[in-house]
């Protein structure tokens, strides 16, 4: 990998009172300002001298009263968990790096940003030394802000605390208050129609939360997109209308974490034209960790697949030949090859008895022609048999699995899904995720 790296880490700066902290993008177009206002954590965002976010709130709400009571720690009865937090210090850094994806539109991607980490605390004192368990009501909370030339991203980090508390996050406070007149291209789910609506409670569309990324046309003529990056073990976020002209991140449900922990990134990118938002999409990849598959370039091959629904031997072998003639790279066996996909009793460890082909022989024939084989497997079978499926499919010579009808949204299913992808990588099996899954750039980490 060809890369250059410039990192500047300034010494921690003690912050007193409610002093504002500013962060700019490398090209100085984005200007992010953090401050404390009436005990709340808020920010403002401009782009090229034009206002983007008038004011937005930062933070989460946490209900830890059961754990606090059980561990003999004073119960935090705050209505807003981040109310009255103290800024301990602010750290700044900059990074400029080139990395090379193994596929996609670009052979190289620049990861260039300025970063500000705001360290906050509530309860206890500044002494976090020692390894022993203590019973102080002390919570640590970091706000990480990155300013790219492509946009600005915010992440919440929970450092490990000496009192060892688990965190039960009930909702997220992150909001985006825009100037009156902004309009959103609202869509509620993957295959729904996008409606251009004003950010007003009177608009019927806002009875449902908006999917992300959400595209906006601002009153000053700019376009913006709000989205989520690096989601792998948290609940899915959507956007709800908190008040007229004010959007708020909405969690699918509550989440439980163990510190130290990073929440997903929330980002906003801005452009003079809508095409600018598309051209800046690489920022979403940059907000994710580098590739974790050492030999990814040796076996991950993008390509076009021919979907086969008539699952008999003659059709499957003819489909392989069709791919050769048409310059396609894969065939994909659709639902039904191992039995009724919606039945928990259907095992994806063997071809259904009413089928007349052998999977290993099919894969061998396809390989001899330079064609790979994908198979559809419903989540019901994946959930029950994944650890048995993967070594078998690698032995058969399967190239990839199309995950069917996966559950999404909850922390449980989000974590399960991403762990399943990790396991597939261990057996050199590619993954295509069906249905309501929303990419958040994790394909950089696991291409």
Give each language-model segment a name.
Residues 21-290:
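N-terminal accessory beta-strand-rich subdomains and adjacent acidic, glycine-rich linkers
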Residues 335-447:
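Aromatic- and carboxylate-enriched substrate-binding clefts and catalytic-loop regions
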Residues 258-330, 334:
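An acidic-aromatic substrate-binding cleft motif
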Residues 1-4:
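Positively charged n-region of N-terminal signal peptides that target proteins for export
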Residues 135-137, 148, 312-315, 384-385, ...:
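Short, glycine/acidic-rich beta->alpha junctions
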